[in-house]
A protein has these predicted regions:
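Glycine-rich acetyl-CoA-binding "A-motif" of GNAT/NAT acetyltransferases
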Residues: 73-76, 137, 163
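Conserved GNAT acetyl-CoA-binding A-motif
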Residues: 120-130
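Acetyl-CoA-dependent GNAT
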Residues: 43-100, 117, 172-176, 183-184
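Conserved catalytic-core motifs of GNAT/GCN5-like acyltransferases
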Residues: 18, 128-131, 148-165
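Conserved active-site tyrosine of GNAT-family acetyltransferases
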Residues: 142, 147, 169
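Short glycine/proline-centered loop/turn elements that form peptide/ligand docking sites
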Residues: 107, 111, 134-138, 155-160
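A short, well-structured alpha-helix characteristic of acyl/acetyltransferase catalytic modules
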Residues: 1-52, 174-184
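Conserved acetyl-CoA-binding loop-helix of GNAT-fold acetyltransferases
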Residues: 97, 103-117, 139-144
Length: 184
């Protein structure tokens, strides 16, 4: 379903297929302490393993990994993964690199571009995600993009000795409306 790896152009951001040219940027992203907290990532990351991982993303037709570029610089990644073709569903995740990306509308526009692509060029019916309850900024952006809270996974993350809930959200094709412009 995601064999085509498009470049998607918005007003402020461009989404480009992840490849080896973004390996160092992506390694910075996955090792950033705030990104690790917001995504609940406990594991360690090896630079060479990360380089190989990102160099092979274009070979997978069951996922779409896109770098978020603003003003010519890498500011994050957005991904459709965990494809369930039988149910026309997948998951979405997004991560932005701190101060150079937060609060500038890059995430909102990236999500809008990705949802527009997914719902107008594929047969997907449902796109879901999980977000930790403490991440109010992300929850607000997801709701603005059309995601609806479906449930709570209690005590889903143990971080610095404290338990945190995860919120399950999704957007369905019939409910989705683009934030900017029309579907035509």
């Amino acid at each position: 379903m995601f064999a085509d790896k498009p470049t998607l152009q918005g007003d402020r951001v461009t989404l480009r297929p992840v490849g080896p040219e973004y390996a160092d940027d992506l390694f910075e992203l996955v090792t950033d302490p705030e990104v690790r907290r917001l995504t609940g990532s406990h594991g360690e990351f090896d630079r060479e393993a990360s380089r190989h991982w990102y160099a092979t993303r274009s070979q997978h037709a069951d996922r779409l990994d896109l770098a978020i570029i603003a003003n010519g610089a890498f500011v994050g990644e957005i991904v459709l993964n965990e494809l369930d073709e039988g149910n026309l569903a997948c998951s979405m995740r997004i991560a932005l690199i701190g101060a150079r990306a937060f609060g500038k509308g890059y995430g909102t526009e990236a999500i809008d571009l990705l949802l527009r692509h997914a719902f107008t060029t594929t047969r997907l019916h449902r796109i879901g995600l999980e977000v930790f309850a403490f991440n109010d900024r992300a929850r607000h952006v997801y709701k603005k993009a059309g995601f609806v809270e479906e449930g709570v996974q209690r005590d889903a993350l143990l971080w610095d000795g404290e338990w945190h809930d995860a919120i399950t959200m999704s957007v369905l094709r019939p409910e989705w409306r683009p934030l900017h412009g029309s579907l035509t």
